[in-house]
Every structure is written in structure tokens, then in C-alpha cells.
Regions:
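Residues in well-ordered beta-strands of folded domains
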Residues: 10, 25-29, 39-40, 77-81, ...
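Intrinsically disordered, low-complexity linker/assembly segments
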Residues: 83, 89-123, 127-129, 134-142
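Helical lid/core segments from catalytic subdomains that handle acyl or acyl-like groups
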Residues: 28-84
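Small-residue-rich loop/turn and linker elements
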Residues: 3-39, 71-74
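Glycine-rich, charged/polar anion/phosphate-binding loops
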Residues: 11, 62-63, 86-90
């Protein structure tokens, strides 16, 4: 998402602004709990560093969300449904000026031909991005996933 300008656009009043960086805000479950909470953490160049910081923030956070994080520009809402192989998901929107992209991915599965598939849904404000931009995201995601080992050794 980061290299695609349209994911950075937000509507404020009668203007369209571009935020400098995107900030993941995602749902997480604490061990032994069925009550999720929303964790917001700045992106890091190294995935391992991001994961460590996200785990630390999640463990330290006691409420549903950190209200100071919700006021930040550049949020991207992320969620996961690892139990479902879906064909579509609808997200809640705060109105026509809500420009925060929302991404949900589900349960991956192996096709008969051996390929792994991963369902995902992107809910974006059509005034800020179009199919061209979602197509660029899909291409970038495909390249990223092609570089992931299925069963990496540690």
C-alpha cells in the first residue's frame, strides 16, 4: 500500500489531503480471551521489528483501543478471519468522507492444482481510489507472497 499514492489520500472538509505514511491499526486477541482489541503501531522496514513492537503494544494495552491512536492521520484498518474462506466482506463506514482503507483477509486454502489462495477484501472510498489502484495493490501483494516460504525453517 505504501508505494500507491491513493492509499495515502484522506478527505478533510472539502479538501483531499495526502498523509505521509500509513499506520496499520488491527484487531488482536490476547491469549485465552475472545474479546479483541485494536492495536495501532507505526510501520517498520523490517517485519520482525514491526511484529515485536506490535506484540509489545498489544500485551501492554488494557482497553479496546488507544484513543490517542484513533486520532492519527494515515490509519489503515486491518482484520483477519482465518476461520473463513470468504468471497466478500462488508465493512462499517463513518460516512461519505471516510477515506480510511479497510483490508480483511481470510483462511488460505490449497487448490486442486496445488496453488495456495488467500481471500481478501479491500474497502476503499471510491472518491479516492479506483480499480487501477486496487489492481496495483493486488500485483504488489502477489509479488510479496511469492517471496514467502511456505514452511520456513527457523
Amino acid at each position: 500500500m505504501e508505494p500507491i499514492d491513493n492509499f495515502h489520500y484522506r478527505i478533510r472538509g472539502d479538501q483531499i489531503l495526502r498523509v505521509d505514511s500509513l499506520i496499520p491499526s488491527f484487531t488482536d486477541l490476547k491469549p485465552g480471551s475472545e474479546l479483541f482489541h485494536i492495536v495501532t503501531v507505526e510501520m517498520e522496514p523490517e517485519p520482525a521489528v514491526f511484529c515485536r513492537k506490535a506484540a509489545q503494544k498489544s500485551a501492554a494495552q488494557s482497553g479496546l483501543l488507544d484513543q490517542t491512536d484513533e486520532q492519527r492521520e494515515g490509519l489503515i484498518y486491518l482484520s483477519c478471519l482465518p476461520w473463513l474462506d470468504f468471497t466478500g466482506v462488508l465493512n462499517n463506514r463513518e460516512g461519505p468522507d471516510d477515506g480510511t482503507p479497510q483490508v480483511i483477509w481470510g483462511k488460505y486454502r490449497r487448490e486442486l492444482d496445488g496453488r495456495l489462495t488467500l481471500p481478501y477484501s479491500i474497502d476503499a472510498n471510491h472518491r479516492l481510489m479506483d480499480g487501477l489502484h486496487l489492481g496495483k495493490f493486488a500485483e504488489n501483494l502477489q509479488k510479496l507472497l511469492e517471496g514467502v516460504e511456505e514452511n520456513p525453517s527457523h
